[in-house]
Amino acid sequence: VKKKTIFIIEASSYQLEYSKIFRSKYGAILNISPDHIERHKTLNKYVKAKFKLLKNQFKDHLAFVKKDDLLISKELKLIKLSSKLIKVNTKGNNFIKKINNKYFLTETNKENLSFILEISKRLKIKRTSLVKIIQNFKGLQYRQQIIFKKKYLTIINDSKSTSFSSSIGVLKANRNINWLLGGIPKKGDQLNLPKKYFKNINAYIYGKSKKFFIKNLSGKIKYENFDNLKDAIKKIFTIIKKNKFTNQTILFSPSAASFDSFKNFEDRGSYFNKLIKRYLNEL
């Protein structure tokens, strides 16, 4: 660790809730959607916990927030920040349009990239260096990770997804989707996916919380339900074998916590990969 070393910390609302002294010179809230309500009890308390990241900042610090986020805008009207506020425009950035790395084509990752550009500008990072890194970035494991791709089939492992909002971007960015979802849903979570995407998706619900997911998908997206992930994957591969030359996407984006059957999302992602490897050998 050197004097100029920059630490990048992802602080959860769980950590921020009880934090009194943690502060960062560059604080960023990318977006806010209903999450962890089972922990914080109300959406308002969840928002307050997130905003502690910015409220603890000093006068010479910078607070980065998404420009058009309704919950962020609402909270900003209620509080006073000591730091300088920078509203990040996540739409219409010409630089982002030039990026051809497929990992950054989803709406969510375009938003992430908008924040990266704004913060790197303040850190005086050379644009040429940044472009090189972005173009060659392979993504993180179990976060919209393409684990298999051939002419007619793409398989994406997005085990990190623990809410509907975290699945929206990847659902919008792909076609002919076989969507695997299940686990422990977030209290009060709702699927806010525009209607035009419904016909593009067939859902395969697995696990004990089927009723919750069926309620959210019913009348919107075609679905089948299964007792476990293995049975759901088996059914998808049966369909793909019959339609081998039709482009298909298998998307594992559970939209729920993993603790019903797994130690964590990494354990869940690893298990998915093992099942996929087995069924690919049978194609």
Please state what every model-predicted region is:
Residues 1-104, 260-266:
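Flexible active-site lid/hinge loop adjacent to a nucleotide/diphosphate
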Residues 10, 30, 46, 64, ...:
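Residue-level signal for inorganic ion chemistry
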Residues 13-15, 34-35, 68-70, 162, ...:
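Short glycine-rich anion-binding loops that position phosphate/pyrophosphate groups of nucleotides
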Residues 63-67, 180-182, 200-208:
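Short internal beta-strands
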Residues 79-95, 131-135, 145, 224-230:
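Beta-strand->loop->alpha-helix junctions that form or flank phosphate-binding loops
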Residues 102-200:
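Nucleotide phosphate-binding/pyrophosphate-handling subdomain across enzymes
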Residues 190-248:
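C-terminal helical cap/extension that packs against the catalytic core
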Residues 255-282:
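Glycine/aspartate-rich loop-and-adjacent alpha/beta segment that forms the canonical ThDP
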